[in-house]
Amino acid sequence: MHNDSNPHRGAARLSRREWLARAMAATMAAGLAWPALGAVPPAGGVTTRRIASSGEELPLVGLGSWISFNVGRDQAARESSTEVVRAFFAAGGRLIDSSPMYGSSQPTIGHALARLGHPAPLFSAEKVWIGDPAQGAAQMAASAAFWGVSRFDLMQVHNLLSWREHLPRLFEMKAAGRLRYVGITTSEGRRHSELEQIMRTQPIDFVQLSYNLLDREVEQRLLPLAQQRGIAVIVNRPFRQGSLLETLQRHRLPAWAAGIDCDSWAQVALKFVVSHPAVTCAIPATSQVAHVRQNMGAARGRLPDAALRSRMAAEVAAL
């Protein structure tokens, strides 16, 4: 993909391979099961992964809404977003993720769901994002009204904001049947030490974090811990908000991409993320129907094994 005659570059790549080999060995020792190269989901449908706390299955690719669905009252943009959601469900998608922080994304999702007759496969993932815990219940009720749902499948504490106060309320709501799962989120590598402590001490069902071909810190501790603790993992920023794809698309798609049924860099990037055995679902955001169909293609076909994942990471890091 990228040739460089500099001998120091070659040494750097060797050390990277050695590091990846050690990381792989540590992962195996931790009990993580990597997919076999060429493994195909039953009947050629979308590949799913189990939520450890319940056994429920979710497709490997979901739909985020940060920026892409923040369209205000632009009716044409709302209808365009509805078509994205329609295509998402048609391709086998389930999990849609949003937050009060995301501007008008919540009412945009609600508009789409209403137009589509509230599709039964929907797995609704929302967040509570407010510093005053006393206002949390009102915010969650407003979010449900925007979506047009009676309860959310998953409620997450957004970016750890006031998590000590919000989590007990969410656990109470879950026990009362007012939501199905409880989670917590972070992004861009923030507050990982605190997140790790929460994962070790709180009975959460989900954790959401950033992970992609370049930002891989979570492989060291958080992803192995999630699998050990039975915590489902949602991955945000799988494309680094588009900057990763901008870099990758300057280069020809490598020959090995066909071996994992990828015909685009977006699918390569997503399959790297979702092939990690601790990852439950990645949530790329898009405002284009063609892109949501392409993204959902990463939930079908073969996944990279550990050896190919190492090669993918090394080659992309060298670009």
Language-model region placement:
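Glycine-rich, proline-tolerant flexible connector loops at the mouths of alpha/beta enzymes
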Residues: 97-112
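Conserved, mostly hydrophobic/aromatic
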Residues: 51, 63, 96, 109, ...
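N-terminal secretory signal peptides
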Residues: 1-14
